[in-house]
Amino acid sequence: MTEMSEKENEPDDAATHTPPGTVSTLQETKLQRFKRSLSLKTILRSKSVENFFLRSGSELKCPTEVLLTPPTPLPPPSPPPASTDRGLPTPTPSPCPVPRPLAPLKPVRLHSFQEHVFKRASPCELCHQLIVGNSKQGLRCKTCKVSVHLWCSEEISHQQCPGKTSTSFRRNFSSPLLVHAPPPACAMNKESPPTGTSGKVDPVYETLRYGTSLALMNRSSFSSTSESPTRSLSERDELTEDGEGSIRSSEEGPGDSVFTAPAESEGSGPEEKSPGQQPPKLPLRKDVGPMYSYVALYKFLPQENNDLALQPGDRIMLVDDSNEDWWKGKIGDRVGFFPANFVQRVRPGENVWRCCQPFSGNKEQGYMSLKENQICVGVSRSKDSDGFIRVSSGKKRGLVPADSLAEI
């Protein structure tokens, strides 16, 4: 026991017997070693973390950094160095892609509705029903002129407004109107058609101009269906009675040339030309002659001075049928206008019949019902063995017994 205690006390004694200078140096070296080990560990850990998050120049980034970090602005390109030698070309800097700033979003234009009283029947844009009423009928957009009901405006007010519609197209025209006033420098040339390199007129332009001219001619030649064409009668009379009647009205339809009366072959004329000065003579129409014979189906009382009164069974010589609803005809010495659906054409070989006894026939079996004094047209030679004649009256056609008909 005494030996062990002695051995344990030996290092203490050695420590106590060591000089104080050596003890301080030993403590300093241990402290330095500990600090070095700590600094080395921290350096290794920091490097490993940096290599993990910032590998090869920020190849991997956390999603938060990608979303939150703003894009680094590129430095402005350095100006090229001024070369002293003018003969050597200066190298142009390669264009680097510059990020374009995003265009600001335009605000969506919505409808701006205001109260409107519609003079014409207008459908609702949402429910497609007519807007009716006397006061405060509905709403209309101030920009695009869209009409809606008061109760339909809430659903359509959040839609985008297309804006003001263009007015380059007009009704009854398939192309924009080319009605620009010519400049004073080229006042003589009213319209210069676009020509190509070869000097030919553009076919598209030619087609559009032809269609526009046809539309204008049709609108000027045909009057409205609700009024009698009194004005066109006076214009035609002035044009046809001028001179010897050689001037033909330009308002007549293209189909009038088919029904032109043949020129008279009489050699009587006010002027006699020498045989050497006789140019090729064109057939001239002195007046619009009768074209076809028609029969009146119904009674028509004249409404204006230039109208022609009709009685059922009257024979009418057609003079002008350029208008679809009002025709010009002649009965004896009377000339005037009458409704086109009040007459029926009488072809060569046909007879005009008047019903003297009413007859009711089955339409499915090919018979036609007639009332008393009704006018119809048919061929007497078409009488079959049973005594029926095939006649027509307006849009109706069928077989009628010959005993109930009387020829006019």
Curated annotation (Swiss-Prot):
UniProt feature, compositional bias: Polar residues: 19-29
Cellular localisation: Cytoplasm, Cytosol; Cell membrane; Cell membrane, Sarcolemma
Region annotated Disordered, chain positions: 1-29, 64-97, 219-286
Gene3D superfamilies referenced in this protein's UniProt entry, alphabetically: 3.30.60.20, SH3 Domains
InterPro entries: C1-like_sf, PE/DAG-bd, SH3-like_dom_sf, SH3_domain, STAC1/2/3, Stac2_SH3
Membrane topology according to the record: Peripheral membrane protein
Record field: compositional bias (Low complexity): 219-232
UniProt key word Repressor: no
Claim: Zinc-finger is one of the keywords in the record: yes
GO CC terms in record: cytoplasmic side of plasma membrane; cytosol; sarcolemma
Modified residues (Phosphoserine): S48
Taxonomic superkingdom: Eukaryota
ZnF bounds (Phorbol-ester/DAG-type): 110-161
Biased composition (Pro residues): 70-82
PROSITE patterns according to UniProt: SH3 (PS50002), ZF_DAG_PE_1 (PS00479), ZF_DAG_PE_2 (PS50081)
GO molecular function: zinc ion binding
Reported tissue expression: Detected in cerebellum, forebrain and midbrain, and in the eye.
Stretches assigned to the SH3 domain: 289-348, 351-408
Protein keywords: Cell membrane, Cytoplasm, Membrane, Metal-binding, Phosphoprotein, Repeat, SH3 domain, Zinc, Zinc-finger
Single GO BP term: positive regulation of protein localization to plasma membrane
UniProt cross-references to SUPFAM superfamilies, sorted A to Z: Cysteine-rich domain, SH3-domain
PANTHER family hit by this protein: SH3 AND CYSTEINE-RICH DOMAIN-CONTAINING PROTEIN 2 (PTHR15135:SF5), STAC (PTHR15135)
Job of this protein: Plays a redundant role in promoting the expression of calcium channel CACNA1S at the cell membrane, and thereby contributes to increased channel activity. Slows down the inactivation rate of the calcium channel CACNA1C.
Assembly description: Interacts (via SH3 domains) with CACNA1S. Interacts (via SH3 domains) with CACNA1C. Has much lower affinity for CACNA1C than for CACNA1S.
Other facts: Up-regulated in cerebral ischemia.
Record's protein name: SH3 and cysteine-rich domain-containing protein 2
Biological source species: Mus musculus (Mouse)
Species lineage: Eukaryota, Metazoa, Chordata, Craniata, Vertebrata
Encoding gene (name): Stac2
